[in-house]
């Protein structure tokens, strides 16, 4: 089994964008989100990581656009951004997305989060967005508690997998935080998807080496948009690792 590659399409104001360290105002626009997602699909991606940044920041929604993107793709989609209650979770799943990420609500509404982990199982993943050892919420604009305390609670609730993002690395192309990923994998039996900082094929090989520890996938965004490598090259590298 090789690591799963999830090319990222982050959407703000109807456009595919990339941020640097999650900061609002640091966007670089890359055009139509559907075009980006279809390009990754054509290149062989079997998953797309689709994010509503406006919903994550609490400043709007691209829900209709994202639902349309999901409908037009033939591959699996992990949908993220602004899922904080039953209504938004049901709406996200109704798009046809294979999996929905819950971030802020896992920190701000633990009882609800614990319930949906048990109820929805594999269809829900928990986004752990980390700065140092502190979690961040609300589009990475607020502190959300201690990583290890929250991880322990979520494990007890039966979280099926974690998407772990080092915010200081995201969008910087400075390499992933391998130490953080090792630590998280050592403290949970749930699979981990790595996000943030991937910039080279060597980074993908380094992440593939963590597969025995529990890393099952990697989200790549900026590196693909910037042309550091293609989806096809990334898939080949992960298959050969």
From Swiss-Prot:
Catalytic residues (UniProt): 10 (proton acceptor), 129 (proton donor)
Gene Ontology molecular functions: 1-(5-phosphoribosyl)-5-[(5-phosphoribosylamino)methylideneamino]imidazole-4-carboxamide isomerase activity; phosphoribosylanthranilate isomerase activity
Gene3D superfamilies: Aldolase class I
GO biological process, one term: L-tryptophan biosynthetic process
UniProt keyword Cytoplasm present: yes
Reactions catalysed according to its record: 1-(5-phospho-beta-D-ribosyl)-5-[(5-phospho-beta-D-ribosylamino)methylideneamino]imidazole-4-carboxamide = 5-[(5-phospho-1-deoxy-D-ribulos-1-ylimino)methylamino]-1-(5-phospho-beta-D-ribosyl)imidazole-4-carboxamide
Top EC class of this enzyme: isomerase
Principal subcellular localisation of the protein: cytoplasm
Listed EC numbers: 5.3.1.16
Pfam families hit by this protein: His_biosynth
Family in the record: Belongs to the HisA/HisF family.
Record-given protein name: 1-(5-phosphoribosyl)-5-[(5-phosphoribosylamino)methylideneamino] imidazole-4-carboxamide isomerase
């Amino acid at each position: 089994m090789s690591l799963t590659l999830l090319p990222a399409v982050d959407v703000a104001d109807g456009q595919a964008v990339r941020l640097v360290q999650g900061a609002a105002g640091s966007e670089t626009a890359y055009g139509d989100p559907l075009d980006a997602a279809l390009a990754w699909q054509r290149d062989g991606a079997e998953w797309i990581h689709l994010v509503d940044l406006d919903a994550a920041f609490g400043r709007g929604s691209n829900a209709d656009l994202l639902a349309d993107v999901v409908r037009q793709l033939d591959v699996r989609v992990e949908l993220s951004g602004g899922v904080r209650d039953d209504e938004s979770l049901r709406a996200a799943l109704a798009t046809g997305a294979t999996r929905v990420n819950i971030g802020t609500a896992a920190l701000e509404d633990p009882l609800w989060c614990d319930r949906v982990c048990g109820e929805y199982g594999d269809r829900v993943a928990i986004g752990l967005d980390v700065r140092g050892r502190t979690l961040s919420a609300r589009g990475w604009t607020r502190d959300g508690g201690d990583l290890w305390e929250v991880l322990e609670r979520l494990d007890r609730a039966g979280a099926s997998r974690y998407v772990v993002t080092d915010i200081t690395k995201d969008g910087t192309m400075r390499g992933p935080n391998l130490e953080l990923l090792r630590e998280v994998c050592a403290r949970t039996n749930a699979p981990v998807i790595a996000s943030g900082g991937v910039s080279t094929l060597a980074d993908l090989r380094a992440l593939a080496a963590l597969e025995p520890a529990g890393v099952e996938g990697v989200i790549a965004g900026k590196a693909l948009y910037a042309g550091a490598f293609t989806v096809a090259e990334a898939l080949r590298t992960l298959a050969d690792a």
